[in-house]
A protein has these predicted regions:
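Short, flexible, mixed-charge glycine/proline-rich loop motifs
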Residues: 18-30, 46-49
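Interdomain "pre-motor" coupling segment immediately N-terminal to P-loop NTPase/helicase cores
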Residues: 32-80
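Conserved adenine-nucleotide phosphate-binding loops and their immediately adjacent elements
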Residues: 77-90
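Pre-Walker A (pre-P-loop) alpha-helix and adjacent loop at the N terminus of AAA/AAA+ ATPase modules
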Residues: 90-120
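Short glycine-rich substrate-engagement loop in P-loop NTPases that contacts/grips substrate
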Residues: 97-104, 123, 138-178, 187-195
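Walker A/P-loop nucleotide-binding motif
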Residues: 112-134
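Walker B catalytic acidic pair
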Residues: 182-184
């Protein structure tokens, strides 16, 4: 009975691990991988039979495939729209090198900054690339298997309202490695949403969960005099994001520049 089970297991392994071009038989009579030169067979001490084993490069390839799978899953949770996954440092056109470099360095130093609960505040006019850099940070960190979520506040509020136990939402929020709050200040200024925004920022602040915020609100407004929750929201953001970064360029909207550069045929057809 045992021999049959063993034989079946060996035959099944042989189907999965086969000799490939470049593989060779070593001096010990075992099959070796032609790429990494590690054994693809092993002799059982039990009965002296050769059994297939996974070579080193196949193990590394399998690990990398598993990592990429996990990164894809994390990215699908992180973003609402597939297009957001295309915002990467590799696709950055380099319109604002200083901001790009700061965002890259944030990712490179994330382990250290995360322990301190420090995030990044990107502020500036419409269309200058604030969201792009926030998404690029999220993409870079999910690729390193960090749990990240990107939200706009109204979207976050709907998710909060539609859930069963609301406390579970905040438990999930502070379990993240990074939260990205996109377009702060663009949401409807209602009492309920302002109160919710404070609760979100306060939960992240108290748990030292780092967050990246993008906003069209000026630094003067952020540091100005406000009453109640709005004042406490901005104070907590500025404490956790101590070096606000202005995202702007003399040429104006990056979004408009990108569209022009990426559609030369359209421009040619219109004669512009």
């Amino acid at each position: 009975m045992f021999d049959k089970v063993l034989n079946d297991a060996i035959e099944a392994a042989k189907q999965n691990i086969r000799a490939e071009e470049g593989d060779y038989i070593g001096e010990d009579g075992l099959l070796y991988c032609g790429r990494c030169n590690t054994a693809k067979e092993h002799i059982l001490s039990l009965n002296g039979r050769k059994v297939p084993v996974i070579c080193k490069c196949t193990q590394e390839r399998d690990r990398e495939e598993a990592r990429r799978r996990q990164a894809r899953e994390l990215r699908s949770i992180c973003f609402r729209y597939p297009e957001q996954t295309e915002a990467t440092f590799e696709s950055d056109a380099g319109y604002i090198p200083k901001v790009s470099e700061a965002a890259k360095r944030y990712c490179e130093s994330f382990d250290t900054l995360r322990k301190k609960g420090l995030g990044m505040l990107l502020y500036g006019p419409f269309g200058t690339g604030k969201s792009f850099y926030a998404y690029a940070i999220a993409n870079a960190l999910t690729d390193r298997l960090y749990k990240v979520r990107v939200w706009q506040l109204e979207q976050m509020y709907r998710e909060f309202e539609s859930g069963g136990r609301r406390s579970q939402f905040f438990d999930y929020l502070v379990s993240l490695h990074l939260a990205v709050i996109d377009d702060l200040g663009a949401e409807k200024q209602t009492k309920e949403l302002t109160s919710f925004t404070f609760n979100v920022i306060d939960a992240l602040y108290c748990s030292r969960t780092p967050f990246v915020v993008t906003t069209n609100v000026t630094l003067k407004e952020l540091t100005g005099t406000h009453d109640g929750d709005r004042r406490r929201i901005y104070e907590r953001i500025l404490e956790r994001c101590p070096c606000p970064i202005l995202v702007d360029r003399p040429e104006g909207s990056i979004r408009y520049t990108r569209v022009r550069e990426e559609n030369p045929e359209y421009r040619s057809l219109l004669g512009i």
